[in-house]
Structure formats: C-alpha cells, structure tokens
Amino acid sequence: MIELDLPLDPGDLFHLCLSVGDVEVAKARLGATRAWVWAPVEDWTLDVFLPGGDVAPMEASVTYSVHGPLHVELTQFRAGPLPAGDDLVEPHHLGYWSADVEATTRSLIARGWSLEYQVGAVGGQPIAAMVRSPAGYRAELVPTTSRPRVEAWLARG
C-alpha cells in the first residue's frame, strides 16, 4: 500500500484543474448549477520538456473561475502529450504556488514523485512543472513570480 505523502503546503494550493473536451461547454455546464464567473479563455501554445530530453508542443485553451480562494481551472488540451478530457468528473491536477519550481521538483522527486513534464523556462526557471505523487495524483508547480499575471487575468473576468 502506498502511503499518502503530502509534502506541499496547503496554503500554496490555488487551483483544481479539470481537463475538459470543450472549455465553453464545460463553462455552460457548471454555470447551469452555480453562478460561476470565469476569466477570459486564453489559448496557449507551449513547449513541454519531457523527462529524457524530448520536447513536445502543447496547445491548450484555459480559463479559471474568478472567485477563490481555491479556483477551478478548466483546460482543454488540443495537442501535446496530455490526453484531452471529456467530462467534469476527475480532477487533472492540483495547482500550487512555488517560490522555486526547480528546487521543489527536485525535492519531490527525492521523495518518490515523478516528473511528467516542465513547461518552458524563464531565466533558467521552469514556467511550470507537472509532478505525480507515488499515490498517483498530479500537482502542478507554478512560480510565485507568475502570481501577478494570474491575478490580473482573473480580474478581467
């Protein structure tokens, strides 16, 4: 049996991602039961760096619920190493702020986690990293330097 290992600070948790087949359909489905307010949908094309050195393009449409403190992220993966979602049932990952994505990733790997991919790099730091726990859940590490951009995006909702 794999022990539950929660080395990330719950205070750094800021979103729950649902992988969806269509962002607009998912927004409508969620809006039918609650008064959700969404940030504008952004279309992203990013280079994803896989373990072993391979690079793959990833295309996604992304939005966040505006109201927190825990935001819901809807992501439609259109191309890349991640499968497209088709429902709102299973979370794709939990998103955490990280002061040092690279160091946090190394620390988690030392605890038995695995790196699924990293996204880009700014000044030597990854823009984000997706890691998987020994128990099987994913966590996305997002640098705290991205927080002002994300908060400005949410304010446009």
Kindly label every feature range from the protein language model.
Residues 8-10, 19-68, 103-125, 155-157:
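Core segments of cupin and vicinal oxygen chelate
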Residues 71-76, 92, 102-105:
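A generic structured-segment signal
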Residues 2, 46-51, 80-83, 150:
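A short, acidic/glycine-rich surface segment
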Residues 14-23, 87-102, 136-140:
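Short coil/turn motifs at helix boundaries and re-entrant loops, enriched in small/polar
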Residues 1-9, 73, 85, 110-157:
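Vicinal oxygen chelate
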Residues 61-88:
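Helix-adjacent hinge/juxtasegments
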